[in-house]
């Protein structure tokens, strides 16, 4: 991962009296929220939402989240970000190994010790649909 360039090294360009500054901050993968995953994430309490956003930013920059586990039952390369807050445990399931995009498959509040089958099935279904769209 490349370090951000100092301001003097930034690319400057003028078009029609407008100055454009292009700053290379390194490789950052775009993110795509599948199904209702963005709405689900927005439904998290503020602290959990902020932490999940920070962890997703790490993934976009090619870093591992601080607390994660693989989810092979859903698919190859699928991971679960674990967020623990006073309001409870929250999860964001994503895959970052398809093309150059981070796909958020599902976001939810965890209420039992084991991830509920419906949450696993929903994430797996969204993954299958995305893989089919890419063919």
Task: Give the residues covered by each predicted segment.
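Basic, Lys/Arg-enriched alpha-helical interface segments
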Residues: 2-89, 98-101, 109-135
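ATP-dependent carboxylate-activation loops
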Residues: 105
